[in-house]
Amino acid sequence: MSEKINTKPFILHSDFRPSGDQPQAIEKLAENLTDGLAHQTLLGVTGSGKTFTIANVIAQLNRPAMLLAPNKTLAAQLYAEMKAFFPENAVEYFVSYYDYYQPEAYVPSSDTFIEKDASINDQIEQMRLSATKSFLERRDTIVVASVSAIYGLGDPDSYLQMMLHLQQGAIIDQRQILAKLAELQYTRNDQAFQRGTFRVRGEIIDIFPAESDDRAVRIELFDDEIERLSLFDPLTGSSFGAVPRFTIYPKTHYVTPRERILDAIENIKKELVSRREYFIKEHKLLEEQRISQRTQFDIEMMNELGYCSGIENYSRYLSGRNEGEPPPTLFDYMPSDAILIIDESHVTVPQIGGMYRGDRSRKETLVEYGFRLPSALDNRPLRFEEFERLAPQTIYVSATPGPYELEKSGTEIIDQVVRPTGLLDPLIEIRPVSIQVDDLLSEARQRADKNERVLVTTLTKKMAEDLTDYLDEHGIRVRYLHSDIDTVERVEIIRDLRLGEFDVLVGINLLREGLDIPEVSLVAILDADKEGFLRSERSLIQTIGRAARNLNGKAILYADSITKSMEKAITETNRRREKQIKYNEEHGIVPQALNKKVGELLDIGQGANQKAKANKQRGKMAAEPTALYNAPKNAKEYQQQIKKLEQQMYKFAQDLEFEKAAAIRDQLHQLREQFVFDN
């Protein structure tokens, strides 16, 4: 990879010193990494300060790191925490930049082809570019990523070749600079100066780098010499001072040199000939005509413009790979001695394994029916075995490690059970199923009187809805967290729970990882003896742990018998509780309540996806999949209907129901046109 310019050490900022199990965990993790151990697991309970431990390990070893989280919300939470620990270093955020993404798809049963449709979040795109730049330029880099890290990214070799190096005193013609900027996909805009654009005023060129959000660079030429390079604020124009050199990175990760594009076109033509022969031989004349027309159009676009819609489907040729080779990803930008930390590994690891299979089945249909060449199958996320080969030294972090992590780590499972705050794991009670609803009503009233909160987890959506109605009818302030709610609204519901807008939150499988609410003093698990995924040992420990941040934490398991999963979960929780009690007695610690600011949670949610907050819809019941709409009477009604339709479209796209998503998209177009016409 490129030569590292910045070798600044990591400087950890914190008001706290490691305590409890943290010092021995930090020492052991660091020692294992120094000894070259490939896999180890940090078994850290809720509230034990796992992130602080990891931050100390990174600072102690002074090595770049990537933190993988299972979703955008937890990635944003980790990013915020790491940013606070390392304000002087490069802490970056790398998640999917799509607010909405509907991939190209074909439904043979109805002969429906759905074009790719996407909405890109400009802020997250800038953060992704900043992440790769930091990995290439700086040693003091921490990148917090979601599973987007295993998806194809532009080839780092092409990316590095395309950079524009500027140096004070260098001899370069103005036209050369402008031509190079155009190659990097920057556009000239002398009126609106924004990310990824440049403007020219006489012999002064201003460039707003694609990876920057608050700094632009000014090139002052004298004849054909760069007389001065300086940085300035693109909003106010105030100068940050002169710099001796500056590197302009491409506007996108997918930029490709002209020679590589021309080589790719020749290879695409050869594959097209082979594919046409196959379809003719199989008497599939419609597919033959379809692949010819679509591919020829793409070739012409690439020849003229250097890119085409869906250019990622030709990534095999553009990155110079052979058939079946893994795509370039964020891992290719990482320094070779980086550390990989997989947070909530019991969820994240299976996610990584499942990404390839889902993507493959959709693409195979496109190839079979002549919409794409077979080489499109190489535009894919990493296979799990490829991820294993590319992953550097790894730390798995979880309160309930999965079988994969335990097998890989062997004996290197580092316990972090003791909390510095002295807080104990919840007391567990088992009560009969026959009284669960009325007993829960009584418990909820007691907690509401003390200004405490309750989480309730059920087995089915129907039961969650019925229970919500029942509690509501009996005067309990209750909300239902369902699968139709997007990431940001989910965070806002949790915020409302913390603020006391309501007292009881009912859910199914949403009340587990990363839901840290200090105000929750009771977790109620209904039908705890129904063995299965939602009532496995791991699920039960995670759910019980939601009450571990409160001084009066309690978990009630409603069950008529004790399953093996329940027995293991209760034994493990009691083991942790006893260890904490012993530690508290030995060190004279009195458990202290957590005073986490409510605002922090909301900021985290908005950081994950700012645009989606417009989709806020506060109904307590699950959203209906389809709805009939009366003609809107005013602008406000139009906006409400548009938001409702957008939510449904996002949901269908997320569930891979592309046909339904496309139908709603068309409905949205009509509604917007009608809105413009009426107004």
From Swiss-Prot:
Positions of the Helicase C-terminal domain: 436-589
Its annotated compartments are: Cytoplasm
What residues bind ATP, as annotated?
A: G44, V45, T46, G47, S48, G49, K50, T51
Among the GO biological process terms of this entry, one is:
SOS response
One of this protein's Pfam families, by short name? UvrB_inter
Alphabetized, the UniProt keywords read: ATP-binding, Cytoplasm, DNA damage, DNA excision, DNA repair, Excision nuclease, Nucleotide-binding, SOS response
Assembly information from the UniProt record: Forms a heterotetramer with UvrA during the search for lesions. Interacts with UvrC in an incision complex.
Q: What does this protein do?
A: The UvrABC repair system catalyzes the recognition and processing of DNA lesions. A damage recognition complex composed of 2 UvrA and 2 UvrB subunits scans DNA for abnormalities. Upon binding of the UvrA(2)B(2) complex to a putative damaged site, the DNA wraps around one UvrB monomer. DNA wrap is dependent on ATP binding by UvrB and probably causes local melting of the DNA helix, facilitating insertion of UvrB beta-hairpin between the DNA strands. Then UvrB probes one DNA strand for the presence of a lesion.
Q: What is this protein called?
A: UvrABC system protein B
Q: Which organism is it from?
A: Haemophilus influenzae (strain 86-028NP)
Q: Which gene encodes it?
A: uvrB
